[in-house]
Regions:
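Short basic helix-loop element that most often maps to the first helix and adjoining turn
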Residues: 15-34, 59
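Short amphipathic helical patch at the helix-1/turn junction of helix-turn-helix
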Residues: 11, 22-23, 51
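Alpha-helical transmission elements in cytosolic ATPase-linked domains
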Residues: 2-3, 47, 59
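Recognition helix of helix-turn-helix/homeodomain-like DNA-binding domains
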Residues: 36-51
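DNA major-groove recognition helix of helix-turn-helix/homeodomain DNA-binding modules
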Residues: 55-71
């Protein structure tokens, strides 16, 4: 499984996820529930403090009705 490693990539992707989540009117807890993650995990991903694997990224995208090309 590929993992995003550089801080700038993590931050950029996290900001994109946060923006999409807010546009969808979802809380971090709601998004987490939809994709099988805890709220704190969503928070760490959005803030760029956690590397996100492709499987997790795909689950987040699906939970918001998106595909991975949003990245």
């Amino acid at each position: 499984m590929a993992v995003i490693k550089t801080l700038s990539e993590r931050e950029r992707i996290g900001q994109k996820i946060a923006s999409m989540r807010q546009e969808a009117g979802l809380s971090q807890a709601q998004l987490g529930e939809r994709c099988g993650l805890e709220r704190f995990h969503i928070s760490r991903i959005e803030s760029g403090r956690h590397s996100v694997g492709l499987d997790t990224l795909a689950a987040i995208a699906r939970a918001m009705g998106k595909t991975l090309d949003f990245v």
